[in-house]
Amino acid sequence: MELLRLAILFAVTALAEIVGCYLPWLVLKQGKSLLLLVPAAMSLGLFAWLLTLHPSAAGRTYAAYGGMYIAVALGWLRFVDGIALTRWDLSGAAIALVGMAVIVMQPSTT
């Protein structure tokens, strides 16, 4: 159950980061309203706070989080941008998630 909770926390953290970066991209690249910068800042603030909830040292958290970030970013590509994923996308995400699991499930040193 702990692994599932951690995976959900990683996924929500990644989503907060992606939203926080996507909204300014809309403002800068597509000329959307500057008001989108308000929820973007809130989302990035949420992202930073969520990082504090992760149970490992910061460096290990960032390393493991990277695997989930890749998977969530590809989900964003598919469901928000509407671009079909390739087998290479899916294979890369699977490899990244396995790497995340190796880091997260290592034996405790305490």
Swiss-Prot record:
Q: Where are the transmembrane segments?
A: 8-28, 33-53, 65-85, 88-108
Q: Which UniProt keywords apply?
A: Cell inner membrane, Cell membrane, Membrane, Plasmid, Transmembrane, Transmembrane helix
Q: List the InterPro entries.
A: UPF0060
Q: Which Pfam families match?
A: UPF0060
Q: Which family does it belong to?
A: Belongs to the UPF0060 family.
Could you tell me where this protein is found in the cell? Cell inner membrane
Topology relative to the membrane, per the entry?
A: Multi-pass membrane protein
This chain belongs to which protein, by name? UPF0060 membrane protein Pnap_4944
Q: GO cellular component terms?
A: plasma membrane
Q: So which domain of life are we looking at?
A: Bacteria
Q: List the NCBIfam families hit by this protein, alphabetically.
A: PRK02237.1
Which PANTHER family does UniProt cross-reference here? UPF0060 MEMBRANE PROTEIN YNFA
